Amino acid sequence: RSLVGSEMCIRDRIFCGCSTAFGGSPNSHTCPVCTGMPGSLPVLNKQVVEYAAAVGLATNCTITQNCKFDRKNYFYPDNPQNYQISQLYLPICRNGHVDIELEDGTTKQIRIHEIHMEEDAGKLVHDEWDDVSYVDYNRSGVPLIEIVSEPDMRSAEEVIAYLDKLRLIIQYLGASDCKLQEGSMRADVNLSVREAGSEAFGTRTETKNLNSFSAIARAIEAEKNRQIDLIESGEAVVQETRRWDDNKEYSYAMRSKEDAQDYRYFPDPDLVPVHISDAWLEEIRSRQPEFKTEKMARYKEEFGIPDYDIGILTDSKKLADLFEATTAICSQPKKVSNWLMGETMRILKEKEMEPEDITFSPENLAKLIGLVEAGTINGSVAKEIFEKIFDEDINPEQYVEEHGLKQVNDEGALRATIEEVIAANPQSVEDYRNGKEKAIGFLVGQTMKAMKGKANPGMVNQILKELL
């Protein structure tokens, strides 16, 4: 069973007007409400309700049109009120499901028990040197939706496929950027093992501090093996919450795992029940976007690009939006796809960034593609310019003019340089004439070097072969 928490992309917090911006100096985005000061009263943010209902609709849930909030009572330093406002008895969404696609081509349905709204807690910062912990309440009161699955997943592969499906749904809705490394998407994995053929579930543990899909997969395998080892050695699995250390690939016990009755839930007296009228629900439904499956079918028909390209582009709302916007400007869908899947993904990997971190405009990418297609610059220069576009979103046309990067297409100038290269490299010339085709690559490289990378490579190859 997986519990997925997602911070919403909303400017204000769930019960107050403080900023939800990531970062900032500790305790700089706080007020009496989100720090739990006596006498402060919460006011529900309407947009949180709309996003939660939208996620519920997208995951085939039944929307609870009269839902309410409850207090979850517990003490922890990052919880200033000593209770968390959440939903237990009447959550906003229930009884949904999503279909996940597995590597062997099969599809499996994962049931969703409920989706509820709640406020986030603060953050503890541990100082190992001074052996103290500091509390930052900048995250306290940030709106969350929690998606609780049924225990339908049987492997790490299924868990990752399920989480990825939810990530895409939430991103396409614009409800969250779902960055695990920043905590805007979090997954707690509840895991138990049982003997083959047994119907009864074993004792479950909950694993926290999972900040990437790969860490989740490693933690699942480690916890599965730990529980099997305990059972096979005659020991009992303890119901507890464990913290994952990805560097050590090991989890350790944090505290005993509580059940709902341990939190002494009761209705929050400061918040009235939420009524979602039929008209309001239909308005939310009418704003549902085109999701990945529908987008893939449209791309195949409208743009005619390969299925592989379509799968990569639609796996991120940011990439899909950038692809469509750039293609609308330059009408070169395959060229746009190549730049996004090639250079863009390469740089993202090098910088350890996500597609959602892209800041360059479709206009400047379209201009770069236009410069290459017109023969104004060659491919190698275009890649250098794209690095600047990625980092600074420069205008490539202006950059080419300012730095004199226009491609040399003058046959006379090219021929003169190539003749000098041939004269300076007799061994490579002889190798080529003796049947070593690769030798011409060296001569092309020397020509490009002599012309500072601005020579037209097609013309260089043609003239070289003619002269040789």
Task: Name each region found by the language model.
Residues 304, 327-336, 374-377, 434-437:
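Structural motif
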Residues 280-287, 324-331, 365-377:
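Extended, non-catalytic structural segments that build the interaction scaffolds
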Residues 159, 310, 336, 382, ...:
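Small-residue helix-packing motif on alpha-helices
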Residues 182-195, 300-322, 333-351, 363-365, ...:
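Core structural elements
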Residues 355-366, 370, 379-449:
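Strongly charged, low-complexity linkers/loops
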Residues 55, 223, 326, 339, ...:
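Amphipathic alpha-helical segments in well-ordered regions
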Residues 1, 6-7, 11-290, 307, ...:
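Basic, nucleic-acid-interacting segments
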